[in-house]
Regions:
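Glycoside hydrolase catalytic-domain context in secreted enzymes
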Residues: 1-514, 550-1005
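Short beta-strand elements
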Residues: 516-547
């Protein structure tokens, strides 16, 4: 028995030790109890409130309903079940949690009202809570289906068991103010559904009776519509609060009588809902602007038919190819099989968001027979409710144009910069901030010209503080003429691809939003320029390197064109030359996959060999030279490290890289999940990175500040506020022992239904890129590097693993890559994270055309490239990544990644050496920037520390020793006991023999 127990204990120790070894990094992070200091916490919470204050968008305010008078309206009725389940943000890696790791904010809207000394109708709220206690499953979109995580709950206003006559009559007596809360939440792995699942709380599929197929998740439900109609007809003042992670259809605000005001507040994070009463009662004037176009009908978007789950196509002949060969871990857990190999056609071309709606208006599309017949509209006013950049205030501003350079009427040159100085004068009754937006409208050449929107955001600025009544502030807006160029991928103007500024007329416009000119008091809101002849940008103005097609044509590094022309996709892309016949009204029928595409579904030994053949001239690098250069002292940069961080091309880098051992290179590259591994040969300890565009450490024991969702930050239109956000999160990261941050999320709001839209900024590449640049600047000043995500084509969640994303190279560059380029060039960004899907036919994390040809050879990017979490190692694999130009493989929670192809060639070892250079430069560059930053200028405290969750390791070791020692004791005890038994048995046997000998003679006698 002792031996059995001992064997069990030894097996247990081995099993626990192996498991802890595999999960050591995550266990340490999860168990960390490192708390923010009071200074960091206070700075973060104050900033979160400011972000919410500046990000709230007021879209309607009839009869100056807002602001409310606190003396007259100290009591309010809060209607809508969503008020009891206030949304902090979306689900997934960008989530926010409260101080106890829960999903209900420490300060929700109701608590915010109470804290502001506003009394709300408790009986009304109690009724909602008794109707449905919580929003089930929404916080776990990674493990649920959309029909579980995206459900709507609202009692019918006609249900007298809920809305009793007594309850409604008392509510009218309680207050003449009704605030109606509408809530929507989506998240990672599930796009918002195009149907409604209602009033069903059980896990699993929703009964047909609880599904409304006539409305989408982002429309109001019939129950919400009836409630809004009731309060609109009953109450003197009605304010609608939109607490949503996604752009809702707000057409009801125009159609239902009595709805006075509307505030878009987004997900407010853990405590920033406290800002809302300050806005509602006029302590703060709204200054946010919409970052998406609000249309009356989602289907008027050119992306509608080819987005979300309904927009995904499935190749007919791919049932035995990845990922159809396994389960989909990203949509509803392990019970959901992939139907086949999926693809997504970006048939809308470059025309997303306002770039579609405004261009369609310029072309008369909204008054065409097509539009009239399909949607029953007759003009822009029937299609767009709130344009991009729209927002109201409690005050009025008058704009004076102070100076323009170059002067109106000038001919622009290749390297010109356009500068517009304006003065904004507060002509209203209260203080407030104001946003000025600058757009350009290029001339479009229908015959043979490049695709281009009718209008594009070029620059924006916001008054840094509230302007007092009767006072003015001056703002300067500027942009490079090269920002107006569009990419020519089909050789219309130049063979081989380049950015081109076509000859013609260009008008710069000062605008209130993407549709309406600003009524300036002096000067002109429009500035006309001209380009005499085509200007070609075939050299990148920042890097000085060649610009050319990387994804279009026949001879391509990745083997396939991103637009599908070389693989027989037959995609018809929309063109401005003929919107009516090219508008993608419905998704095309599923098609077959070409044989040559089938052969490249997964990375193979032959692919690795082909790469090696193309790099056969590589020389074997020196490894493990044993030198004594130390750019690191543990996690900290030495003086040498700071000097190397200042210059990627410092010749001493070669000596440092020579010292790194091959085993250290392997460990660094292979195991990049939330860490940059130890490199003892140069003095570097393991550094840790953390996820969370809204909140660092949201998956750990003690999280950082839960900020409003990133979209709210973008709604502020304030790049300096974005820098402050980067400062705050970077400082928190340092205080909690982290060196890197998985942020910002800078994919596009291609569709309102994108599950992770809340993590991303907007539908506009310029706004997205400039906000991201601000965040990057601030974070780097604290010494915290960032991995901006997700590069590229990750604009929806449905079937994200291995999704083939087909688009033109112009679309790729002008829309989706532009935010990354801006963040790198203007924000100093030194880290990017790749995506789950494919850019065309090739996984983005393994695309040599993307990571080497474009990112490094064209853009001159010297930082690190990290993959996203590798669910399937046979697809998102380290072999393909390192050869394509990636650096860190996020091989997963168990850190079990390994190379499957050869790793002894000179080319391979050189690729690993390059990866180390990129990663180390990223880390040291952040340290260098921090060393030249004075935090006192921003009133912030930055104190670095180590993660303290590693206490469990010595405890485990001691426990192992005690258990093994106990097992050994049992074995020894068992042996001794066995020996004792044997001795006793032997003694008994001898005694028996003696007795036998004595008895024998008597027997014989």
């Amino acid at each position: 028995m002792s031996f059995s127990i001992a064997a069990f204990l030894v097996v247990l120790v081995v099993a626990i030790s192996v498991a802890c070894g595999l999960f050591a990094n995550m266990i340490t992070l999860r168990l960390s109890t490192k708390k923010l200091g009071s200074a960091e916490r206070q700075f973060g919470e104050n900033l979160a409130t400011q972000i919410e204050e500046e990000g709230v968008v007021m879209t309607k305010n009839d009869n100056k309903t807002l602001p409310l008078d606190k003396d007259k309206h100290s009591k309010v009725n809060v209607f809508g079940w969503a008020a009891t389940q206030w949304i902090m943000g979306g689900s997934g890696s960008g989530r926010s949690v409260n101080s106890s790791q829960g999903y209900t904010p420490d300060v929700d809207f109701l608590k915010a009202l109470s804290d502001y000394d506003i009394e709300y109708n408790q009986k009304l709220i109690s009724m909602y809570k008794s109707f449905q206690g919580s929003r089930p499953f929404w916080y776990d979109t990674l493990n649920t289906h959309d029909y579980e995580s995206c459900r709507l709950f609202e009692p019918s206003i006609d249900d007298k068991s809920r809305y009793t006559d007594e309850l409604l009559n008392e509510a009218k007596q309680f207050s003449d103010v009704a605030i109606v809360v509408l809530g929507r939440a989506a998240g990672e792995s599930n796009d918002a559904p195009t149907v409604q699942y209602k009033n069903y709380a059980n896990k699993g599929k929703v009964p047909a009776a609880n599904i409304d197929k006539t409305r989408t998740f982002l429309d109001i439900s019939t129950e919400e519509e009836a409630l809004l109609s009731y309060v609109g007809n009953t109450y003197d003042k009605v304010i609608v609060v939109i607490n949503s992670t996604n752009t809702m259809n707000l057409g009801f605000m125009d159609k239902i009588d009595g709805l006075d005001s509307c505030l878009i507040v987004g997900g407010t994070g853990n405590k920033a809902a406290g800002a809302l009463p300050r806005v509602i009662y006029g302590e703060v004037s709204p200054s946010g602007r919409t970052v998406d176009t609000y249309a009356y009908d989602f289907s008027t978007a050119a992306t509608y038919a080819n987005s979300g789950m309904p927009g995904v196509g499935t190749y007919n002949n791919t049932t035995n190819l990845y990922p159809a060969t396994g389960n989909n871990p990203n949509v509803g857990g392990s019970d959901n099989k992939y139907p086949g190999v999926s693809y997504l056609d970006y048939t809308e071309n470059i025309y997303i968001g306002y770039m579609w709606y405004e261009t369609a208006d310029a072309e008369g599309f909204w008054t065409s027979d097509f539009a009239k017949n399909k949607w029953g509209v007759n003009g822009y006013q029937d299609v767009v409710q709130y344009p991009f950049g729209y927002g109201l205030s409690y005050t009025q501003f008058k704009t004076d144009v102070v100076d323009v350079s170059p002067k109106a009427g000038s001919e622009l040159t290749k390297n010109s910069k356009i500068t517009v100085k304006v003065s904004v004068y507060n002509d209203g009754p209260v203080a407030g901030q104001h946003v000025v937006q600058l757009y350009f409208a290029p001339e479009y050449h229908r015959d043979g010209g490049l695709e281009k929107p009718s209008i594009m955001l070029a620059a924006f600025a916001k008054t840094p503080v509230a302007v007092e009544p009767g006072k003015a502030q001056e703002l300067t807006l500027e942009f490079d003429v090269s920002d107006m160029a569009t990419y020519d991928c089909y050789g219309k103007k130049i063979d081989g691809g380049a950015y081109v500024l076509e000859a013609g007329k260009y008008q710069v416009r000062i605008m209130d939003d993407a549709h309406n000119l600003t009524a300036v008091r002096s000067g002109s809101a429009t500035i006309d320029y001209r380009i005499g002849s085509d200007i070609v940008y075939d050299v990148d103005p920042t890097s000085g390197k060649e610009v050319k097609n990387r994804f279009t044509g026949e001879k391509l590094t990745d083997g396939f064109a991103v637009d599908g022309t070389t693989s027989g996709e037959g995609i018809k892309y929309m063109t401005r030359a003929d919107f009516e016949t090219s508008f993608p009204a419905e998704r095309a029928a599923n098609r077959d996959m070409a044989a040559e595409l089938k052969a490249k579904v997964l990375y193979t030994k032959a692919d690795a060999q082909d790469w090696a053949d193309r790099h056969s001239d590589a020389e074997m690098p020196v490894m493990g030279s044993g030198g004594d250069l130390r750019p690191f002292d543990g996690k900290k940069a030495t003086d040498l490290g700071l000097e190397l961080g200042a210059d990627y091309f410092d010749p001493r880098w070669e000596q440092v890289l020579d010292q790194i051992k091959s085993s250290e290179l392997d460990a660094l590259v292979l195991h990049g999940y939330v860490q940059e591994n130890t490199i003892a040969s140069i003095g570097k300890d393991k550094t840790s990175s953390v996820d969370g565009p809204s909140q660092i450490g949201s998956f750990n024991q003690i999280p950082g500040t839960g900020f409003p969702m990133p979209t709210v930050l973008a709604q502020s239109f304030n790049t300096e506020l974005a820098r402050s956000f980067g400062l705050a999160v970077g400082a928190e990261a340092q205080a909690m022992g982290y060196s890197g941050w998985y942020a910002p999320g800078i994919n596009m709001h291609r569709s309102p239904f994108g599950g992770r839209n809340y993590e991303y900024y907007s539908e506009d590449p310029m706004l997205t890129g400039l906000i991201a640049a601000g965040v990057s600047k601030g974070s780097l000043q604290t010494g915290t590097y960032l991995y901006a995500k997700h590069m590229i084509g990750y604009d929806q969640e449905s079937y994200r693993d291995g999704l083939y994303c087909w688009m033109t190279e112009q679309t790729l560059r002008d829309v989706y890559l532009k935010p990354f380029k801006l963040a790198i060039d203007k924000g100093g960004l030194t880290g990017v994270m790749t995506a789950y899907g494919r850019i065309g036919a090739v996984w983005s994390g393994g695309s040599e055309a993307l990571l080497t040809d474009l990112l490094r050879d064209e853009w001159g990017f010297n930082g690190a490239v990290l993959t996203d979490y590798a669910d399937h190692h046979n697809f998102m694999n380290g072999d393909q990544m390192i050869r394509a130009g990636g650096d860190l493989w996020m091989d997963g929670l168990m850190s079990k990644g390994s190379f499957k192809q050869e790793k002894t060639s000179a080319a391979f070892r050189q690729a690993e050496r390059n990866a180390a250079h990129h990663v180390l430069y990223m880390i040291l560059n952040a340290a260098y920037i921090h060393s030249n930053y004075d935090p006192s200028a921003d009133g912030i405290t930055i104190s670095s520390s180590d993660i303290d969750g590693g206490w469990w390791l010595p405890v485990l070791i001691v426990g192992d020793i005690l258990i093994v020692g106990g097992a050994a004791t049992l074995v020894v005890f068992g042996i001794l006991r066995k020996d004792k038994k044997k001795a006793a048995a032997a003694e008994a046997s001898e005694s028996a023999e003696a007795n036998k000998d004595e008895e024998t003679p008597d027997a014989e006698a």
